[in-house]
């Protein structure tokens, strides 16, 4: 009898493990998603404890993967009081044979923040080489010293092979800084640029104000660098009014102009996508990639039928005759 029970238990456990390993999640719970493809599977990295991860063979059905970090980086806990390992808004890029992951350490409504950096040679947790090696802080912001917020990184390599990091949330908007050729620090001498700002009243730098812009993502297409940002407010469930705005420039340093020719440093930005109030109350924090010859936009949307919980949004992007992206249904 015990032997039969043991066999039954083994079969049930095997079934449970099979279910866990299967790609069965069609609408993953995500916030601030970015993606990478390793040649066989797609991986989502997003806000969560230790950085949440999903993987998929086809971009349609997903499964949970282990978080990037088992424990919060000690340097970040010391640098950012109140940070407990719930890590925001990562970005990932494959560069010089490694996957470089950048991530945000902060607390809500404050700009005592830091952007960290980790490396791995593979994304597959089953690969014996799999190990995220934390490299520490790239840049941080401190009230009274910086009028910007060091979160929401996006790293892009320009046409000359130079790595740049754009980042920012509220305060004085979106910044751009040159990185070293190893992506492990800010390049010297330092080069800083301002890319996007929404106009607001002057406030003490300890306050975010109403400069509601964040989540920059730069994508190159047809001779232009396109700057995607998110306007207005996330994280309020059904009351969120997040939306995606865009501008473009022939120089990664800017200026970025919207469809009307208005600078994104002067409250410009053409609205690309927002909540339809049928499926999503709001949509934002996007990333853009080319997979299998098709350009895709990924974001999170606050689902009306799930009481405003954030889920993955995936849309194809096409381009109009003037070279501006069009979000397909």
Please name every model-derived segment:
Residues 19-329:
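Carbohydrate-active catalytic/glycan-binding domains of CAZyme proteins
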